[in-house]
Amino acid sequence: MNEIRIRTAKPEDAAELLEIYAPYVTGTAVTYEYTVPSQEEFASRIRHTMEKYPYLVAEQNGEILGYAYAGAFHPRAAYAWDVEMSIYIKKDRKRSGIGKVLYETLEKILAEQNILNVYACIACPEKEDEYLTKDSIRFHERMGYRIVGEFRECAYKFCLLYTSDAADDL
């Protein structure tokens, strides 16, 4: 059975999720984190997120291929109806439809939670380089997101300044 299965993440998934996340930390500007978190820290992040928001994994034949989660957009009470989503897919499984299934499932759960606004903060290069392409921008546009703002040169990684685009789901 080769069907992709979406399920709720568990803190015990931390090691497998870190295998997916670590290359993004060490070799890309997709995430602005400099150091790969420990397995304990990552499990703690999963637990903390799941106190209020969904955290999903995509698996096939028992192997986790990617994950996506929502988190608070801003800590102030008036933003309680807004979330920021993040997604990470195994590098060799990108463009296989996993991201689409994860996002669609996550968005459905968020709608059931009465979340009104779904945002993504997307690292975006002025021009593509070895650390960052516009693949995430293109993915989000295909998923119906639109760029609504820009934080110019807000992040410094690999001795380069990067811009982040804010996108919302139509």
Model-predicted segments: where are they?
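Conserved acetyl-CoA-binding loop-helix of GNAT-fold acetyltransferases
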Residues: 95-108, 134-138
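Helix-loop element at the rim of GNAT/NAT acetyltransferase active sites that forms part
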Residues: 19-36, 49
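A short beta-loop-alpha structural element at the N-terminal edge
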Residues: 5-17
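Conserved catalytic-core motifs of GNAT/GCN5-like acyltransferases
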Residues: 69-72, 121-123, 137, 141-160
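Conserved GNAT acetyl-CoA-binding A-motif
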Residues: 110-132
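A structural signal for short, well-ordered beta-strand segments
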Residues: 85, 118-120, 167
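Conserved small/polar residues in nucleotide/adenosyl-binding loops
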Residues: 162-170
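Acetyl-CoA-dependent GNAT
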Residues: 34-92, 103-104, 109
